[in-house]
Amino acid sequence: MANFTAADVKRLRELTGAGMLDCKNALAESDGDFDKAVEVLRIKGAKDVGKRAERATAEGLVVARDGALVELNSETDFVAKNAEFQALADAIVGAAAAGKIGEVDALLAAKVEDGRTVEQAIADLAAKIGEKLELRRVAYFGGTVEAYLHKRAADLPPAVGVLVEYESASGDATGADAAHAVALQIAALKAKYLTREDVPADVVENERRIAEETAKAEGKPEAALPKIVEGRVTGYYKDVVLLDQPSVSDNKKSVKALLDEAGVTVTRFARFEVGQA
């Protein structure tokens, strides 16, 4: 007897974009386990499954100030456009910057300018407008920082925010320009890690396993599997590791190569996107 329902199939389809029958078969093969079903779909070649599965269902905005980046969520984009909601986000990121706060719990306990805690200010506005509001995440970097905010639509507040902490050998505009280019790169290509060494070992191993099983499913010869797997893992690194990515400004060079030319070292970065995990 199947350990899933028609509603589960529909949910997996909405999550991954794969076909209805493919989703049904993947759930059957994974005994109803959603994470395993996503892997099954990846192995069998469903396009963009991994990327689509990261999506969440939230509205809201991101805001940055003085080394702090905050994501504040609402239930609808109507509220995200509300002036009071945007003012609240500005007050919250101000509290994060002033207190050098990079953790949600600490920021909820911090105070905004009128003396209320961030948690109380959020609760008060939620009660007033009748929607659930949530402080989703916060980052704070204390070094030299470049911030970039991107709007999905002209009538909506920024939905993508990037912070890049960096060191520049020259300390002039060249370094700032390079950091800005990197922030744009992160916003567009969604790097998850700074270096290959930052990718967790279990994540790499899982990518190797999926690459091998995919190659086998495609009928590739056994002797060719190691080379194919290494090639696909290298491709994975180019997708998710910032320094390995081809630069959007010059795709013949990696981000690392362009940063080296500019004498810039990125020490860490954060990328928030409303509606994504």
Curated annotation (Swiss-Prot):
One of its GO terms (molecular function) is translation elongation factor activity. It comes from the Bacteria. The keyword NAD does not apply. One of its GO terms (cellular component) is cytoplasm. Gene3D superfamilies: 1.10.286.20, DNA helicase RuvA subunit, C-terminal domain, Elongation factor Ts, dimerisation domain. Pfam families: EF_TS. Residues 76-79 are annotated as: Involved in Mg(2+) ion dislocation from EF-Tu. Keywords: Cytoplasm, Elongation factor, Protein biosynthesis. SUPFAM superfamilies: Elongation factor Ts (EF-Ts), dimerisation domain (SSF54713), UBA-like (SSF46934). InterPro entries: EF-Ts_dimer_sf, Transl_elong_EFTs/EF1B, Transl_elong_EFTs/EF1B_dimer, Transl_elong_Ts_CS, UBA-like_sf. It is found in: Cytoplasm. Belongs to the EF-Ts family. PANTHER family: ELONGATION FACTOR TS, ELONGATION FACTOR TS, MITOCHONDRIAL. HAMAP family: EF_Ts. NCBIfam families: tsf (TIGR00116). Associates with the EF-Tu.GDP complex and induces the exchange of GDP to GTP. It remains bound to the aminoacyl-tRNA.EF-Tu.GTP complex up to the GTP hydrolysis stage on the ribosome. This is Elongation factor Ts. It comes from Mycobacteroides abscessus (strain ATCC 19977 / DSM 44196 / CCUG 20993 / CIP 104536 / JCM 13569 / NCTC 13031 / TMC 1543 / L948) (Mycobacterium abscessus). The gene is tsf.
